[in-house]
């Protein structure tokens, strides 16, 4: 649909605050582990998905601070862990942490990933891509 027709007799006015997208925010939060520099994201929704992502990146050594309600600062000066075992069953984001940890630490340990129950979503293509880049998967 290219347009909306609104009828009502009165002009619309006011402001609408749009929340950030949890899926995009979680992936950007994970990507912050790639650099030692501070990364600041705004309009980040604070809900379960971003809280689990926060737990994943702080578990591996990143520092994270909520500066404001929807502004988060992250810095991964020293990534000290290559394991996200207990968190991997909470959602599927841990599979996206694989290349980040391989880059920063050189190895990674992640058991079977969890997440929602919307149907089968295999991770084999992630693993095959890592193998093509030289990773060994056991």
What are these regions (language model features)?
Residues 1-138:
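Structural preference for solvent-exposed beta-strand-turn elements
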């Amino acid at each position: 649909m290219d347009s909306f027709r609104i009828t009502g007799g009165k002009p619309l006015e006011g402001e609408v605050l749009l929340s950030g997208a949890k899926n995009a925010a979680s992936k950007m939060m994970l990507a912050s582990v790639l650099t030692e520099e501070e990364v600041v994201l705004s309009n980040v929704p604070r809900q379960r998905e971003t809280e689990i992502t926060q737990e994943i990146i702080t578990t591996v050594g990143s520092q994270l601070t909520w500066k404001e309600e929807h502004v988060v600062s992250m810095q991964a000066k020293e990534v000290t862990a290559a394991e996200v075992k207990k968190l991997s069953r909470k959602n599927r984001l841990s599979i996206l942490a694989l290349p980040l940890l391989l880059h920063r630490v050189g190895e990674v340990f992640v058991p079977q990933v969890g997440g929602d129950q919307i149907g089968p979503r295999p991770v084999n293509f992630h693993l095959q891509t890592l193998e093509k880049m030289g990773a060994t998967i056991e």
